[in-house]
Amino acid sequence: MLIFYFRKVLDCRAAEPNAAHLVLSRMEADGKLAGIVTQNIDGLHQKAGSRKVHEIHGSALRSYCVHCRTQYGPDYIFENQDPVPMCPKCGKMIRPDVTLYGEFLPHLAYDNAVGLMNTSDMLIIGGTSLAVGSAAQMAHLFHGRYLVIINKGPTKMEGKADLVFHESIGSVLSELYGDD
């Protein structure tokens, strides 16, 4: 069931970055962005050109063998016609490299995200209501000077924010940082 769901719903190979992804990539290239912490699993930040991306829920564009830990790219699992893709090296199941409910967050991504929360002057929270526990917990770890929230709807942290925009993150970042 998981593999069927993964193949039919999570195939994000054809997705393209939006204005927010592109502006964040430019900000990173200009030295204005220390990193991106994302709970999205679509790889669009990297597709836009960002390199300092910490995927706290993993990536749908990676998969691995649950036994020998061999890594596989997105085409292997999405194009494989077997009911459950099996590792050609050891014969065990291959699973998507995404964090499912009840699983622990990837340690390296989590540790890097915590490091950013501890060392950054400004945190921009964008495109999330902070309803998912891991994102909300990350936001509470930030103790820098400025908290900016950009989300179409309300969030739980607006009372602590220095600036709040109830608009799309792409339009706000494009307006503030400029379009190319």
Positions of PLM-derived features:
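Conserved catalytic alpha/beta core of Sir2/sirtuin-type deacylases, generalized to analogous enzyme cores
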Residues: M1-D180
